[in-house]
């Protein structure tokens, strides 16, 4: 539905209903039964990237600010999860690095928020961010699945998916082909683009990283 939700008619409907901000999330193959057939191919992802930026054109756009969770990584310094800027707490109280990454080693019923933020998985996130210097490839799961698999294994984090508990190997195996196909296209786009001189990069200082 990537063309439907970026169409002129859909955007105009949002504006008419008073919407002034929209954040697009790409499909993530989370869960044992998740289909990889629903993942965008490189051509489709490039279309979404360009279309979302066209919609949010401040001079000629329709009056709604749109952002793309995957394609606008450069404006927030890549992945913001794992406590860098945000994390997710599921219905069971498990402190997860991201709403899409159901692994954890801490729970708010047993740990303070500070303890949750200092859990090994979150610290591994901070040690490895940014997960890719090309911020069109920001995610440790979708575009860099080898990293997520490694840090979950190294930290001993457990699956916290309440519907379909899934090993990190199974999850990441669904992302390798996508990552391999997107990488050359993303690198070409990144190398041909001009980037902000003073980007938002609140990373852990290199001298403090444990990697």
Predicted features along the sequence, with ranges:
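Flexible mid-to-C-terminal extensions adjoining Fe-S/redox cofactors in radical SAM and related proteins
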Residues: 100-211
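Active-site lining segments that contact anionic ligands and/or coordinate catalytic metals
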Residues: 84, 92, 134-136
């Amino acid at each position: 539905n990537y063309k439907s939700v970026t169409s002129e008619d859909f955007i105009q409907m949002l504006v008419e209903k008073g919407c002034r901000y929209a954040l697009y999330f790409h499909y993530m193959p989370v869960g044992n039964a998740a289909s990889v057939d629903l993942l965008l191919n490189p051509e489709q992802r490039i279309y979404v990237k360009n279309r979302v930026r066209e919609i949010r054109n401040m001079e000629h756009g329709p009056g709604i600010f749109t952002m793309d969770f995957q394609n606008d990584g450069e404006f927030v310094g890549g992945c913001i999860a794992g406590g860098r800027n945000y994390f997710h707490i599921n219905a069971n109280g498990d402190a997860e690095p991201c709403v899409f990454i159901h692994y954890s080693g801490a729970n708010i019923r047993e740990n303070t928020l500070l303890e949750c933020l200092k859990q090994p998985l979150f610290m591994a996130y901070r040690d490895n961010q940014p997960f890719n210097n090309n911020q069109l490839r920001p995610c440790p799961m979708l575009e860099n699945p080898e990293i997520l698999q490694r840090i979950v294994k190294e930290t001993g984090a457990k699956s916290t998916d309440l519907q379909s508990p899934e090993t990190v190997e199974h999850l990441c195996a669904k992302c390798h082909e996508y990552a391999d196909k997107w990488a050359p296209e993303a690198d070409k786009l990144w190398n041909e683009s001009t980037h902000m001189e003073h980007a938002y990069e609140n990373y852990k200082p290199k001298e403090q990283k444990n990697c």
